[in-house]
Design a protein with these regions (language model features):
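Hydrophobic/aliphatic anchor position in the core parallel beta-sheet
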Residues: 5, 27, 88, 170-171
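Residues immediately C-terminal
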Residues: 2-6, 36, 179, 195, ...
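Conserved segment of the helicase C-terminal RecA-like domain
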Residues: 25-26, 183, 187-226
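Conserved interdomain linker/interface between the two RecA-like ATPase lobes of SF2 helicase motors
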Residues: 17-28, 33-109, 138-149
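Walker B catalytic acidic pair
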Residues: 1-3, 174, 192
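Flexible beta-alpha connector loops of hexameric P-loop NTPases
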Residues: 4-9, 28-29, 65, 145-152, ...
Length: 226
């Protein structure tokens, strides 16, 4: 799965090694963001001497609406929640930026009293014992989640479970959302369209943009994503 990572400078080796070193193995290669796959089909056939079947589809089960806005981030989130487009996942490219936005959004009234009470009941038995725990609990009680690789796994899982129950209006996180996390996000909001790739700051690749934005409007949860 996620075969588009084959071309990644750092992670691609995990996909390249088995294909190149196990020629007698049958592979099922899947990705939602690959373009022309003729090269891979021909290469696999050369490696194992067997025909390669290509199955393609350009239809998305849940259509996406794209928009561009220059209004402040908090104002954009407030507007989307008011328009019924929550939960909103706000994509950042540093953990600090994600946490800063979560704090900023506490000034908004994103969740109703009933929704806040539901979150409070859901996390009543959760122990927020780490130094960062009380801050996370404060945000969650406002209907705001934080999600990135720097959090303890139990906190990330908690945010995912609350999101699956529809108890969070906004989630501030990094592009970890684009890596195999199945949460019912209706709207994906990019805080910016460039990121530091370890060497330089560059505009997001089309692959990264579609991988992340494609998490909006999940089948079985929404009729449309934003």
């Amino acid at each position: 799965d996620e075969f588009h990572w084959y071309a990644d400078r750092d992670r691609g080796v995990a996909w390249q090694v088995p294909i190149l070193t196990l020629p007698r193995t049958r592979f099922l290669l899947m990705s939602a963001t690959l373009g022309d796959v003729t090269f891979f089909a021909e290469a696999l056939t050369r490696l194992n001497g067997l025909p390669t079947a290509t199955v393609t589809s350009h239809d998305r089960p849940v259509p996406l609406d794209y928009a561009y806005s220059e209004i402040p981030l908090a104002q954009a989130v407030d507007k989307m929640v008011a328009e019924g487009k929550a939960p909103v996942y706000v994509v950042h490219f540093t953990q600090k930026d994600a946490a800063d936005s979560a704090q900023d959004f506490t000034s908004l009234d994103l969740a109703t009293r009933e929704e806040k009470n539901a979150v409070a009941a859901a996390i009543e038995e959760v122990r927020f014992t780490s130094p960062y725990g009380p801050t996370l609990r404060k945000w969650l009680r406002q209907g705001i989640g934080l999600h990135h690789a720097g959090l303890l796994p139990r906190y990330r899982v908690l945010v995912e479970r609350l999101a699956q129950r529809g108890l969070l209006k906004g989630i501030c996180g990094t592009d970890t959302l684009g890596v195999g996390i199945n949460v019912p996000i209706r709207t994906v909001l990019f805080s910016r369209l460039c990121k530091f790739d370890g060497r330089k700051t560059a505009v997001l690749s089309a692959r990264d943009f579609h991988q992340i934005s494609g998490r909006a409007g999940r089948k079985g949860f929404d009729d449309r994503g934003y």
